[in-house]
């Protein structure tokens, strides 16, 4: 299920933080408020994001979207992405259904 949001949901869009603690705080707030969290511009911060998603127990349910609308578009679960960096214009979608 790759919906950005479902009926009645709230979407929060944030630029990727440079600190683990900031990302953990965003995730905690979204989990508590049951909002969908989109993290933009992941790029070189992917390793930080990956470790935080693992620590929070959501690596297998979070989605990544790379090169959307392009021939090389990728939409998959974050746990499936094995490279060390992502393109600058990438998105992580975190849901708490």
What are these regions (language model features)?
Residues 1-29:
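Class I SAM-dependent methyltransferase SAM-binding "motif I" and its flanking Rossmann-like core
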Residues 30-97:
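A contiguous loop/helix-start segment that scaffolds small-molecule binding in enzyme catalytic cores
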